[in-house]
Amino acid sequence: MKTSILFVIFSLALLFALSAATEIEETDRACGQFWWKCGEGKPPCCANFACKIGLYLCIWSP
């Protein structure tokens, strides 16, 4: 009984992870959001975000 419950839980977690990965792959974002790497060769930060020099991360800036 415990084994079947664990199997169902892990199966649902795997299904969720695969669907999230597919969603990210299909949206193909053209800009970097919060804590995304930025700089040379990387996509620019989205609106309301700025690339912080030294950290090279997109940080929210009003």
Curated annotation (Swiss-Prot):
InterPro entries recorded: Huwentoxin-1 (IPR011696)
GO CC annotations, alphabetized: extracellular region; host cell postsynaptic membrane; host cell presynaptic membrane
Superkingdom of the source species: Eukaryota
Disulfide bonds: C31-C46, C38-C51, C45-C58
Signal peptide: 1-21
Compartments where found: Secreted
Known tissue expression: Expressed by the venom gland.
Alphabetical UniProt keywords: Disulfide bond, Ion channel impairing toxin, Knottin, Neurotoxin, Postsynaptic neurotoxin, Potassium channel impairing toxin, Presynaptic neurotoxin, Secreted, Signal, Toxin, Voltage-gated potassium channel impairing toxin, Voltage-gated sodium channel impairing toxin
Positions of the propeptide segment: 22-29
GO MF: ion channel inhibitor activity; potassium channel regulator activity; sodium channel regulator activity; toxin activity
Domain-level remarks: The presence of a 'disulfide through disulfide knot' structurally defines this protein as a knottin.
Family: Belongs to the neurotoxin 10 (Hwtx-1) family. 33 (Jztx-1) subfamily.
Its biological purpose: Inhibits voltage-gated sodium channels, preferentially subtype Nav1.5/SCN5A (in cardiac myocytes), but also Nav1.6/SCN8A and Nav1.7/SCN9A (TTX-sensitive Nav in rat DRG neurons) and invertebrate Nav (in insect neurons) as well as voltage-gated potassium channels of the subtype Kv2.1/KCNB1. Is suggested to bind to site 3 of the sodium channels and inhibit the inactivation of the activated channels, thereby blocking neuronal transmission. On potassium channels, inhibits activation of channels with an IC(50) of 8.05 uM through a voltage sensor-trapping mechanism.
Protein known as: Delta-theraphotoxin-Cg1a 1
